[in-house]
């Protein structure tokens, strides 16, 4: 349950409520908002009558969350969560959509990575993405350079100022990845790796959580709940496509409807990944447009300096000239949505 305190509730009022909740075995999370202090009480509500809390000094009202993802629920927090970085970049709410671009895997050619990063920075992108540890279906496929790739990403950040997004696959690598990355990505295959979710929940880094290829929206939000429950509220959701019976023309089925559904159910920001969502280079632009129109807070796109020689996912990667053209058109569309129609990309109700 959620206890919303009065505007003029004192510190003593708040402490009295939290002490009572703790006595009855609740896990208590206190949020000090601009107007009201909100107390999340996680536990068995049958152990304590809500009427007892409601009668306490300083309590304005009590709300009960309908969905099992209590912390991620819009019922708990009506305002959009906005994740702000030290360089001023903001993800979520009515802020301009962000772009996370880069190769599927960081390769030995650092100059190629820097070429992509430099172009992305010049265009106005905010994040450089690239895999250091890659989960591959086949054991014979390239599975990443490990720490060497992380060093390349960090070096590119130094030269361009872009924030680094990279995937964490194993709890054992958490400290290593955190040393280099600005944002930790939990990939689709690990969406229900609960030990990993618990670990990233205890670190102080923003997390991009990708939807599993066969996961429902409820399962997706419950995965985010694991991260939130363990203390990390800096979660960015990512729709990246579902497995489908029809994989002849697309690698996955990109669930565009998930964006407005999640915007309604949750306060967390959500981005789209049309590269993995379709697996086809020519579909990246139209599906990115579709995602932005329905409210996505950003787009993740695979960009390679030479897709024909990419060690992984070249077929779904844009070249730098292609990305420049796509980015320019997407930016024009974003401007139109904001200025001509007075819309906000966050799809507020």
Give the positions of each predicted feature.
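N-terminal amphipathic alpha-helix/helix-capping segment at the start of soluble metabolic enzymes
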Residues: 67-100, 337-343
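Catalytic beta/alpha-barrel core
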Residues: 6, 145, 161-172, 182-195, ...
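N-terminal small/glycine-rich loop or linker at the start of catalytic domains
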Residues: 83-105, 134-139, 263-272
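Hydrophobic faces of well-ordered beta-strands that scaffold small-molecule active sites
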Residues: 97-103, 126-130, 164-167, 182-186, ...
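Catalytic alpha/beta core domains of metabolic enzymes, predominantly
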Residues: 203-303
């Amino acid at each position: 349950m959620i206890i919303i305190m009065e505007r003029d509730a004192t510190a003593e009022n708040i402490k009295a409520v939290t002490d009572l909740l703790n006595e009855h075995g609740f896990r208590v999370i206190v949020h000090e908002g601009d107007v009201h202090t909100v107390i999340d009480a996680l536990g068995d509500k049958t152990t304590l009558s809500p009427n007892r809390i409601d009668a306490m000094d300083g309590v304005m009202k009590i709300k009960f969350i309908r969905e099992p993802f209590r912390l991620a629920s819009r019922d708990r927090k009506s305002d959009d969560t906005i994740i702000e970085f030290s360089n001023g970049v903001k993800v979520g709410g009515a802020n301009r959509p962000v772009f996370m671009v880069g190769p599927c895997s960081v390769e030995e050619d650092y100059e190629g990575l820097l070429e992509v990063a430099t172009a992305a920075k010049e265009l106005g992108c905010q994040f450089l993405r690239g895999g250091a540890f890659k989960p591959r279906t086949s054991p014979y496929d390239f599975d990443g350079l490990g720490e060497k790739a992380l060093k390349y990403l960090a070096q590119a950040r130094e030269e361009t100022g872009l924030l680094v997004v990279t995937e964490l696959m194993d709890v054992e690598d958490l400290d290593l990845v955190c040393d280099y990355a600005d944002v930790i990505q939990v990939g689709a295959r690990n969406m229900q790796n609960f030990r990993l979710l618990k670990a990233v929940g205890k670190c102080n880094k923003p997390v991009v959580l990708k939807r599993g290829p066969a996961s429902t929206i409820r399962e997706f939000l419950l995965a985010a709940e694991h991260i939130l429950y363990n203390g990390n509220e800096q979660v960015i959701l990512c729709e990246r496509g579902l497995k489908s019976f029809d994989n002849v023309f697309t690698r996955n089925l990109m669930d565009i409807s998930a964006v407005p559904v999640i915007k309604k159910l949750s306060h967390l920001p959500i981005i789209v990944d049309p590269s993995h969502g379709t697996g086809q280079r020519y579909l990246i632009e139209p599906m990115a447009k579709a995602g932005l129109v329905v409210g996505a807070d950003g787009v993740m796109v695979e960009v390679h300096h030479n897709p024909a020689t990419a060690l992984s996912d070249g077929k779904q990667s844009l070249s730098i000239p292609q990305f420049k053209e796509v980015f320019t058109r997407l930016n024009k569309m974003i401007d139109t949505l904001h200025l001509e129609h007075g819309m906000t990309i966050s799809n507020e109700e």
